[in-house]
């Protein structure tokens, strides 16, 4: 159960991967999307919505990852639309809030926490309450696990999301004479895009050459980004699958400037394509970003630290290549088959 499905995100990609792998192993999997909330005083709209049926979109509606599961969008958030099941998985805090109120026959509730959302959502108090739910919780990093234990007294199973090595790979790394630095654009301030741009500008101001490569799904026309940065750069809008892989492979360094991440799949994907990683300590990234070993890590919002680490890789080819190789090995430690087996095991244990 999710609260949206159109937006390309690391979390959504991971959830679709888990769901489709479970389906391919013979499990019956259904994918429900919550209805958009209706204001409490609009009883007319609530009545109309309650008379509608679930809208089912074909699997190919998801055009940015492989998917064989129809998307079922609820007309209104009511238990009558949810079938009886063995397991019910909530994802975003909105889904956990709804799922926790459903009767037991809708399935044993698992809350798959992909981020500590109360850090950035407008509905902080509501999100915080969901972490106190007594259901079983799965998290994608020890950083989230520690937050749940320290702030809510809740334990959780850690299931680090792997990278699909059949999709993200690099047959033979080719290094660019002028290093290409890749980063993600996002309009959430905590994604740190502006910090990353400032770090890149500082590196350029100190006389270093680089080619900036930015990708994202928020802006089809990158001109506002060019205007804000004060220079133009290579931009890719909603790259998916092979286009995304080729973009990673063409770059030398991946720059992550987020303030916090539940895990940070874009950095992992880039590392699988043999990019060297320069990142802030986002919390979740510590599953794979080991400072001076698999990445160069600075503190969040530390633009000086980010620019310093970028310069180190621009000036030190041996360090650049060693981080690439060790980072690649680290990412390969995470395996989809093992993760799915662990997930199924958790589900089975809850039913005994």
Specify the residue positions occupied by each region the protein language model found.
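Conserved donor-binding/catalytic core segment of Leloir-type glycosyltransferases
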Residues: 138, 172-191, 197-201
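Short alpha-helical donor nucleotide-sugar binding micro-motif in glycosyltransferases
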Residues: 246-251
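Aromatic "clamp/platform" in nucleotide-sugar-dependent glycosyltransferases that forms part
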Residues: 259
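Short glycine/serine-rich donor-binding loops of glycosyltransferases
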Residues: 264-267, 285
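Short hydrophobic beta-strand element within catalytic cores of glycosyltransferases
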Residues: 276-279, 289
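Conserved acidic donor-binding segment of nucleotide-sugar-dependent glycosyltransferases
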Residues: 291-292, 296-303, 312-317
